[in-house]
UniProtKB/Swiss-Prot annotation:
Subunit structure: Part of the 30S ribosomal subunit. Interacts with proteins S7 and S18. Binds to IF-3.
GO (cellular component) term, any one: ribosome
Record-given protein name: Small ribosomal subunit protein uS11
Organism encoding this protein: Bifidobacterium animalis subsp. lactis (strain AD011)
GO BP of this protein: translation
Gene3D superfamilies membership: Ribosomal protein S11
Amino acid sequence: MAAQKQAARKTRRRDRKSIPVGQAHIKSTFNNTIISITDPSGAVVSWASGGDVGFKGSRKSTPYAAGMAAESAARKAMEHGVKKVDVFVKGPGSGRETAIRSLQSAGLEVGSITDVTPQAFNGVRPPKRRRV
């Protein structure tokens, strides 16, 4: 009985298609940096973040963690055949430039770099200023 149940749960493995050109979306916040590498249509090929590569707490927000995450995402993307990426950077965090440099050093060719940080036209009230 148990053997039949296990055989019924087999899932189909996705076939890997070669994607020569992709997009790298870097979301850099004050607490973490998330890198997603997608194909031109926007389907995610690989991703990594500061927490994904083993950093916890305030260490996730460091430029070093962003670099390690970018390297990890680039390695996974290169297994899918990605060779060149157009970079889209969003957010005010400290890991922006380091992540782009790490993508280049991992072996990906960076085509263009675009800042897509959303700008509020007098939207919500910003958080109060810190008193340290």
